[in-house]
Design a protein with these regions (language model features):
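N-terminal strand-loop-strand
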Residues: 1-34
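Short, charged/polar surface micro-motifs in flexible loops or helix N-caps
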Residues: 20-21, 28-31, 40-41, 88-93
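The catalytic Nudix box helix
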Residues: 34-67
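Structural detector for helix-capping/boundary residues
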Residues: 37, 51, 107-110, 119
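Active-site-adjacent beta-strand/loop module that shapes the phosphate/pyrophosphate-binding cleft
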Residues: 70-95, 105-107, 120, 127, ...
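Short, charged, solvent-exposed linker or helix-capping segments at domain edges/interfaces
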Residues: 94-100, 115-118
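Charged phosphate-binding loop/patch that engages nucleotide di/tri-phosphates or the phosphate backbone
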Residues: 114-140
Length: 140
């Protein structure tokens, strides 16, 4: 496996509100994705995740301190390493920077798994859902 510095680094937000996940259409409008983008020089992964959630989906909120995982993908000959953070959404704007070419959809966890094509991302989310369920059972 290639070293992480041989990948283009990206960060993503997994936006959650009222038990639902926010998805947006990809830049070409053909797939449903979570907000993500390139980590710019001088920016942390968390800052990037929050910025992309705002630009792509019009969402404001707070990230969990630690990422829930990461996944790899290839596109147009480049390899990407995406760090994923859970985002607790506190505000949803009716207008946002990329509104003119992205759709936003709130889906149940089941709907998320039906729409997301990146298998590694789906696995990260599946494990997170299971972990949260176990924590709630332990508290009961």
């Amino acid at each position: 496996m290639a070293q992480p510095d041989m990948y283009v680094r990206q960060a993503a937000a997994l936006p959650l509100r009222n038990g639902r996940v926010c998805l947006v259409t990809s830049s070409n409008g053909k797939r449903w994705v979570i907000p993500k983008g390139l980590i710019e020089p001088g920016q942390t992964a968390g800052e990037t995740a929050l910025q992309e959630a705002w630009e792509e989906a019009g969402l404001l909120g707070a990230l969990d301190r630690e990422p829930i995982g990461s996944y790899l993908y290839e596109k147009e000959g480049l390899r990407y390493h995406v760090t994923v953070f859970v985002m607790k959404v506190t505000a949803v704007a009716q207008d946002w920077p990329e509104r003119s070419f992205r759709q936003r959809s709130w889906v149940s966890p089941t709907g998320f798994f039906e729409r997301i094509e990146e298998g590694d991302l789906a696995e990260i989310v599946r494990l997170t859902v299971l972990q949260h369920a176990e924590e709630h059972l332990a508290e009961a």
